[in-house]
């Protein structure tokens, strides 16, 4: 059950239960899948050694009133020799029922959630120049995510894409949507050095519609006997 220390959004991620979930991959203690949150924590009951941490620009998208921040991130010292403290991706730390059995980072994938449908319709309405309808969808979603229901927002012809892009990051962070979003919007991205990051790997720029947005065809499929599959641009 939801406790005083958890809001409904946090409970959805810590217990895989919510009226907002349209379809999820069900799991039980005796029948479950992989550990979705492993790479974000690598917790060994002594320390956290994450493979990835969220970028500063993502953290800065959330306001103090946004209930999603506490559900999505938790600041912890890492177990690496440098001992740095950093916000970690918390939404996949694991289902509490599994954690009670010392089974970490196991969550039920939530393939369809109601909030995604609101975001899809908001974008569709904005593309149809129905900015009032798009604003209503975004505001309805945000009121469910902000303390006191204070999430009203308005979009226009000039700002709708920027606002919807930011809201999709806040709501769907690390759920597998970002690549397809950038492809759909014909946008590139740039990785910039972060606080305490290493120089190597801290800078990368991919332009819009770069061929690398499409994964290369696996080599074994190209070279298999009798294969008539042709390489795509990413193979070249």
Residue spans for each PLM region:
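Aromatic (Trp/Tyr/Phe) and Gly/Pro-enriched flexible surface segments
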Residues: 39-44
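Acidic/polar-rich alpha-helix caps and helix-coil junctions
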Residues: 1-38, 49, 62-236
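Residue-level signal for threonine
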Residues: 54-55, 218
